[in-house]
Amino acid sequence: MAALPTLADIEAAAQVVYQDFAATPQYRWALSSERLGTECWLKHENHTPVGAFKIRGGLTYFDQLARRGALPREVVSATRGNHGQSMGWAARRHGVACTIVVPRGNSVEKNAAMRALGVTLIEHGDDFQEAREHAMQLAAERGAHMVPSFHADLLRGVATYWWEFLRAVPHLAVVYVPIGQGSGACSAIAAKRALGHGVRIVGVVSAHATTYADSIAAGHVVQAPVTTRLADGMACRVADPAALAILAPHLDHVVKVTDDEVAAAMRDLFTDTHNVAEGAGAAAFAAAMQERASLAGLAVGLALTGGNVDAPMFAGVL
């Protein structure tokens, strides 16, 4: 299993993150608590400067490159959107060129947000895996630095949001976290272990992109088709082996949520909090609602991981 960041690592990462923005809020929303039938806290990662938690990992990844004197001329990576915005933000901060590969048909508004951060955007392939393979090829051809979607230096930054959450609401009994490439869920595990917290961590996958659920059940990486229409942040076809090695022994269990359940959660969160949640951002609430009967009397923490959904799609959901 890959080494998880220590408490000292996470505290140092927080100081890097806070050079760009303050700790995000977490609120106990009355209507969401009423809907869930128990104390419900939301961690608002949709309030970062790129509208998603990924920026934290981008900042610490580039900080580590700078500390090693290894900042490249150009970075290349692949994304469905939020990781790409993270890379664009951090690359611009350090004066590094950034090329991002997205699959064809990617979110129009996420693409626009990346371009606004100075990213050179390339559309290639029919899903994230094909975009990733093309990005690796481009990086090799150009002599550029390929940034993976899962890496220890990304993890230490992402772990800061769970460190914030568990310190702010120490009585949380169970938390739900969506799994895309795995950094968010692995960071929850890292923060829990670093703080010596007893919280149960429940992973959430799309029922239409089940590679992590299938791989955990099988004990090895299992590819699974991706057919989700809403949860592009969880649209992963092949689980990352390093992430899988961390998740498998430490998740309490994994919940699969359908697009219909995600859509209902997006509507509920907007009604209850007037915050916009993208599909992956609403998945944790969808999973908690699915398990509502078992949560009575527990303090439940949910990661609203991002709010970057195209307006026409969100209007259709509402």
PLM regions and their residue ranges:
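PLP-dependent amino-acid enzyme catalytic core
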Residues: 1-318
